[in-house]
Amino acid sequence: MKFIDEALIRVEAGDGGNGCVSFRREKYIPKGGPDGGDGGDGGDVYLIADENLNTLIDYRFEKRYAAGRGENGRSAGCTGHRGNDITLRVPVGTRAIDNDTQEVIGDLTKHGMKMLVAKGGYHGLGNTRFKSSVNRAPRQKTNGTPGEKRDLLLELMLLADVGMLGLPNAGKSTFIRAVSAAKPKVADYPFTTLVPSLGVARVGADRSFVVADIPGLIEGAADGAGLGIRFLKHLERCRVLIHLVDIMPIDESDPAQNISVIESELYQYSEKLSEKPTWLVFNKIDTIGEEEAQARAQEIAEQIGWEGDYYLISAATGQNVQNLTRDIMDFIEANPREVAEENTEADEVKFKWDDYHQQAMQNPIEEDWDNFDDDWSEEDEEGVEFVYTRS
């Protein structure tokens, strides 16, 4: 299935139903009083995280999603039905953004987590609500309010512990294949990897971490060169970044310069992302021998002013790969992910007597029924009363 990590959709919550103006009419009860019911609340629109999904492709074709409108109130004090809610299923890791204001509404980072993205309109009040000792036959009501409407940008951000950085053909996909059961495409030409992929690296019987591979960056990626930097967002939730460097590039480019290019593009994209813990890993040491690789790696580290440790591996042959994965696992266990307490339940619907209805009671809509005769009276000119008889 095609990997789609962005989609723009329109969500429309349902309008609230209008209140009803009605009076009770029954045999032998000539002055029954008001019995108009309230309208129903409009339906809400929710997003829910589903671990069985891994792409937003469904939302590329159907763009509009509308919840049900609340029904109008009816006579006999009947309240209108609430509008039907709709729930849209998205992959775990999806972020919802209001496309007009760029407000981040929330992140769905756990399976089953539910989020309200468009609130339904409030119900209108029927004339029964306006009955009082001085207003015994009220003809006032209120209308329901419109539901919330939004242009919603959905962004899928992969949830991984480790993120891979590097130029095209640095060996990132080969490394993923070496440490996990994932099988991303590997070839000897640039941009073999076109979409992000995940792999689960197992260290021993009961220890594992998730590693994310993204398409390689090139100089000018922040300005749109190559595949740009659109996939860097998938690294935002990683705990550590692995900067994989070809120690002896086939194009004879300078590895130190290549490292500077990646660091520059990363900083231009996000200063926060560039401050994440980053490990320097020199790959393809099997092409030049370990002793020469040691000397060359030390020289490169001095050129770029690298102060921390670095690793030398060969993803193709597996040389030193186990030591690297073991150290990554130890680092991840020593630095657990900071998880804020997140409510997996959606916001509850407010009680119907909220501030809106308190204000609406002050400015009701008056029904103008010039010919409406709510009760029979002896003062009527004809003095006629209808009597129902069974035939």
Curated annotation (Swiss-Prot):
OBG-type G domain residues: 160-333
CDD domains (UniProt xref): Obg (cd01898)
Pfam families from the UniProt entry: GTP1_OBG, MMR_HSR1
Keyword annotations of the record: Cytoplasm, GTP-binding, Hydrolase, Magnesium, Metal-binding, Nucleotide-binding
Positions of disulphide bridges: none
Transmembrane segments: none
Function: An essential GTPase which binds GTP, GDP and possibly (p)ppGpp with moderate affinity, with high nucleotide exchange rates and a fairly low GTP hydrolysis rate. Plays a role in control of the cell cycle, stress response, ribosome biogenesis and in those bacteria that undergo differentiation, in morphogenesis control.
Similarity comment: family membership: Belongs to the TRAFAC class OBG-HflX-like GTPase superfamily. OBG GTPase family.
Protein name in UniProt: GTPase Obg
